[in-house]
Amino acid sequence: MSVWGMVHALTIRSPVARGSLKEIKCPALPEEYFLITEKNIQGENKLADFPVPVLAGEKLSYAGQPLAILVGPVESELEDIASRITIDAEDEKASFSITSNDPGDVIVGRDLISGDPDMALGEGGIIVSGNYITEIQEHWYPEPHGALAVPFSDKGKKAEESLTIYTSTQWPYHVRRSVSGVLGWDDGRITVTPTIMTVHLDGKIWYPSLVACHAALAAQVTGKPVKLMLRREEDFMYSPKRNKADIQMCSTLSENGSIHGSIIQVQLDLGSEGVFADEIIDQTCLGALGTCYHDTFKVDGEGVRTNIPPQGPMAGFGLSQGFFAAERHFSHIADYVGQDPAEWRKNNSLKKNQNLAIGIPLKDTVPLVELIDAAASMSDYYRKWASYELLRKRRRSEKWEFAGAPLRGIGIATAWQGSGFLNHNETENSNYSVEVTLEKDGFLEIKSSLISSSARYLDTWQNLARDILGVDPSLVRLTSNTGEAPDSGPGTLSRNISLITRLMEQCLTSIRKMRFRNPLPITVKRSIKPETINGWVPEKKIDLSAFAHPSWGAAVTEIEIDPVSLDPNVRGIWLAIDGGKILNERRARRTLHTAAIHALGWTCREQLRYEEGKIPIEYYRYYDIPAPDNIPPIKVDFLKSGALHRKGIGELPFSCLPASYVQAVSQAMDYHFEKIPLNARDIWDVWKLKQMESSK
């Protein structure tokens, strides 16, 4: 996208992970070129809702932190000037560990207890423990972050008094509030027009606001339209990633193998700032308790500040990391007590009218037994598990060697997913709206700030208009810019299908009742305000509706390990889902299929980590996302539940597929693996260990 008179911008970044900025040494700039620093900020130097500086001042918190914006008409000239800019910074000792941190580095904490788990563990008996680690993951969206800021005149106003931002964002109103805050303007002077984007996996929820602020600052200083587009490599290095989680679990078991008490320690790497800190810590702690019942439990959670870029959501806000730990732990327990992991889960799963640990009651039937049996039936799980288990036990008495035959295993895991933010105060505005107008000419206009970020739902909304009002889908038009559309909140956590579609349906139903009694045009606006209860922290309210009707899923993964390369090859993935009322089954299957591919990448392919606060360039060059010829057979089936609620389902594969995969590899190797990504080197290390043990 470009406009007449547009200039370009690029970002000057910190070379150190932690320190103090002394000086930015810039060569003499040609005419029409500018270097913009935090001293040019007329408003507040932070994003709305989050403590993220727009441009660093004296304090430097991570390598790659934006220090200045270089602006000019020719991109190649900007790159040449940037190469001659030097940063004088005093380097300080940085923190990169979440397990050996200073107490002052804890951004957010949770201390949750139910019953007396310490006494339960003190009584002795069977105790099972594990340390479960999930590494970071890149969103790898098709287009890097970027923004175009266009100053304009309207009815005699000066050009710099109004601004339109074009950017690919899940949260247009957050962009507006952030830009108006940094410019020192009223919100109404900023219009955000979200551009169409494809699969983003929550990578476009808050970072576009930072890029938009940079472009807007440049437009304010120069009085010209400014386009700032990150290079793909730059985006990869400095944009948020799925945060790392380190979860330790220790459980004592009753005689029948059920969990008598659990003590869980959750440590999360949130990077330099606590973006969505409360939501991520709460959802991770909830996920770490899993889908099974604990007689008593204690959860100690910490979100830790380190000197890497701010970390954030990735296809959810921490449930997946928590569920990986819980589901691996449950499989470990089942293995320890000699039970089929599927049968153990069926005997210990949550039930209707029990509460989630945070206090939200489960109002619907909990269909875990049915889902486990459905996934098992699709995959022939029970027969395969028994067969592979016999082979595993036989190998214990044999010498480990390259016998030529592949080792096979099969794993199962379960999870649930809410639909919306758990924390009522996570965003400034929690009263979200949709507006629908039936025009005289037969057109139907839907106004929602979520539409552009959820373009794949357009046909769903068009079909609703056809079914309720008889409006031809071609006559449905969508408006999403913040100048006309109401605030519908961020497009994440399946809010588009569970909340916005419900509001839209209410608008359409109201118009149907009015259309033959009232003259056209007819406009109806519907809003929703969360029903809140007290959460784990007294001053933090949680949204009861977001998790009262969760979706549920079960995943089975079958693998075989090549006896020469030790690469695990996936023979099949089976997903059984209770998604409530499904509006478009074909689209729902596609959503789950895509999510399963990305979840598989996180589980076994996408090797990525920070080293001394930076991502080595090799990780970017060789980042290994699943290619089409690497995608195994994936089968999805939906449980026919007759539910009236529409439920989010897109995160379920991330929450149950990784644990099922690792369990399958664990059965094949007769070893309890506890981390992802899990690769051939990890398997090779265990293979050598097995050879040493068998030779004794």
Task: For each feature predicted by the language model, list its residue ranges.
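Cofactor-binding beta-sheet edge motifs in enzyme active sites
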Residues: 1-370, 377, 387-696
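Short, basic alpha-helical nucleic acid-contact segments in DNA-binding proteins
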Residues: 378-382
